[in-house]
Amino acid sequence: MFMGEYTHTIDDKGRLIIPAKFRSQLGDDFIITRGLDHCLYGYPLIEWQAVQQRLASLPSTNANARKLVRYFYSAACECQFDKQGRVNLPANLMQHAYLERDCVVIGVASHFEIWDAERWASYQDAAASDFDQLAAGFDGLSF
């Protein structure tokens, strides 16, 4: 399970250190792709296969389903770590998430996300002010 929040810096070559706790769960190969809210999603291969199955169940006759699947898959890339635990982020993914230098890597249970640090701070501020209302909106949810 991916948990926690880690601040890192992208170097001039587009390389980002992934937290050691996450690397141990990812294995040698993993997937990074576009995520919602202008962040990046990272998946271990086993979870990526589950995502693929869910996307394959969408009706290909539905234009919005086709658009979603194309947009999601077209940016997906299989990644590996270098010897320092860094991953090279493709330019198109960095552009999607507005990544330049300072970023935050967060755990989200089955996957991890990579956010621009300023965008993450803004997102967190908005979520914090609505946290009680957000939780109340899901009947039967308890912590």
UniProtKB/Swiss-Prot annotation:
Disulfide bonds: none annotated. Pfam families: MraZ. Its main location: cytoplasm. One of its GO terms (molecular function) is DNA-binding transcription factor activity. Keywords: Cytoplasm, DNA-binding, Repeat, Transcription, Transcription regulation. Residues 5-47, 76-119 form the SpoVT-AbrB domain. The keyword Hydrolase does not apply. InterPro entries: MraZ, MraZ_C, MraZ_dom, MraZ_N, MraZ_sf, SpoVT-AbrB_dom, SpoVT-AbrB_sf. It comes from the Bacteria. Signal peptide: none annotated. GO terms for cellular component: cytoplasm; nucleoid. It is found in: Cytoplasm, Nucleoid. One of its GO terms (biological process) is negative regulation of DNA-templated transcription initiation. Belongs to the MraZ family. Forms oligomers. HAMAP family: MraZ. NCBIfam families: division/cell wall cluster transcriptional repressor MraZ (TIGR00242). This is Transcriptional regulator MraZ. It comes from Limosilactobacillus fermentum (strain NBRC 3956 / LMG 18251).
